[in-house]
């Protein structure tokens, strides 16, 4: 793994894409298609009308100019044909200008619409559904691909007009002289085959180009997040090579794409003059035979150019092909499976009892969590411990319905989480994470934002409970300091995430490794404030330190995705496997007690001991004895 992958040195100052954490606070509703914005449709129609009108003016011009020339040569006065010709020229110029104006607005409007729908689809889904898409890939889809896809409506309108021009010119040419029209018609199949081949070959190349572009963007974002680690390790050149490794493939696809484009333009550039020359030659012969006038010959030459101009549609066709591939990529985000909420609410004044019934979570066909009959009493604090990959974060996500289990269900105060309304769930379940995403607003806004916006006083109380009030007040503008201008350390950033969770604490509060960047003394102070200053409720804490597990009422020990045992920290410490989770090993001995390996002072306000009544209320499908591991003799 590259140093960027873990990004331990990325720090809070390096903003991550809010792909996952924003979703946790987004008002997700039942999935339904988002209709296109009406202004985009109106602008598309305007582009089409202006393009078609310009094409009609272009087709009418040669006839008017030819008639004007004949009248001037014969009578010296063209009458109303001269101002008509001038009006057609001026009209085409104005219509082309209007087309350019409306095309720009149409592209911008549709790009915003595509980007909004893709982003909504991303925010509606559960985090595990977005996990296969790296942040760089998502960023590319929402920026470059959305812009390409947004240009499709205007490109289609322009393509339709570009086809009207040669078809109208061919009809007008047939009205002037059928023999010249037949001459031009013989060359059109070659142009049609040219466009068909260009569209077929370009599609695969554009798709490969966009995939490679997304891969480079993803690797670059990883490197930027881990820039501190890369600099400290001195692996900048290696990371540069890793990020740019796909560049050769990108260059090859880009050269191939432009080669196809150039080949199409080159071939059409040969065919168009040949057709024009042939039409002019036939027209000259017809003029010599007395079948055409000088004005008719002028019209014939111009109509031959317009008819053969179908080859100019290659660039528009290329834009449509790129837009089609880009739209396919943005539509993948738009159509992601949405989280559906129910209509029920929690019973009032519930204690926050949590039950996991027959829960199984699979990833890639592999079981990462199995929890059946696990009951957490309301108002208790339960530490979730286990080795890396044991399923701690998965259990924390399932407990508050950040993800839905593949089998089974979760109850909160007797109500299934998947049957709760979004407001009921997010009001009563709060989260704090290892790397909170706080946005770009002020500190007060970051802490206050949630399912319900917290008051200023509640924000301050939550900040004091999280140990953040002191350093926030020392900032130049206090709570009104914009986060991008706040020089926060990793621990301070994490404390603001805790403050946000405390400000919105309901009957269930889940701390997913949310104190990993705090020193042990600060962590202990936060734990005390959590018990005294935050709304009472059930706490589910993903713990990596023995001191945290010791202060909890109960410990839920996970191993290989399954519940190994449930009990107090002091009871489980008698098991060598449990001690090894904290790196204590068998040599620590059962007599080391709950505080073994804990940080200094962490046990000052430890939770209940082995005789606590809370121990008998957790572990099975109902009240009963705690499931404990088989005791192992401590080795000296």
Curated annotation (Swiss-Prot):
The induction field says: Probably part of the ramC-ramS-ramA-ramB operon.
Is Oxidoreductase one of the keywords? Answer: no
Q: Where is the composition biased (Basic and acidic residues)?
A: 627-636
Residue positions binding ATP:
386-393
Q: Where is the ABC transmembrane type-1 domain?
A: 45-322
Q: What is its main location?
A: membrane
Q: Where in the cell is it found?
A: Cell membrane
Q: Spans of biased composition, class Low complexity? A: 607-618
Q: What happens when the gene is disrupted?
A: Deletion of the ramC-ramS-ramA-ramB operon on rich medium leads to an initially bald (no aerial hyphae) phenotype; after 4 days develops a substantial aerial mycelium. No expression of SapB, normal expression of chaplins. Wild-type mycelium on minimal medium. A complete chaplin-negative plus ram-negative strain (deletion of ramR or the ramC-ramS-ramA-ramB operon) leads to the complete loss of robust aerial hyphae.
Q: Give the transmembrane region(s).
A: 45-65, 78-98, 175-195, 269-289, 297-317
Query: Compositional bias of type Gly residues: which residue ranges?
Result: 589-606
Per the record, membrane topology reads: Multi-pass membrane protein
Which key words are in the record? ATP-binding, Cell membrane, Membrane, Nucleotide-binding, Transmembrane, Transmembrane helix, Transport
A molecular function (GO) term: ABC-type transporter activity
Q: Which PROSITE patterns does the record associate with it?
A: ABC_TM1F, ABC_TRANSPORTER_2
Q: Where is this region: Disordered?
A: 589-636
* Transport keyword on record: yes
Record-level GO cellular component terms: plasma membrane
Intrachain S-S bonds: none
The highest taxon in the source lineage is Bacteria
Q: Name one GO biological process term.
A: transmembrane transport
Q: Which part of the chain is the ABC transporter domain? A: 354-585
Please describe what this protein does.
Probably involved in exporting SapB from the cell. Expression of the ram locus (ramA, ramB and ramR) induces rapid aerial mycelium formation in S.lividans.
- Family to which the UniProt record says this protein belongs: Belongs to the ABC transporter superfamily.
What is the name of the protein in this document? ABC transporter ATP-binding protein RamA
Q: What organism is this sequence from? A: Streptomyces coelicolor (strain ATCC BAA-471 / A3(2) / M145)
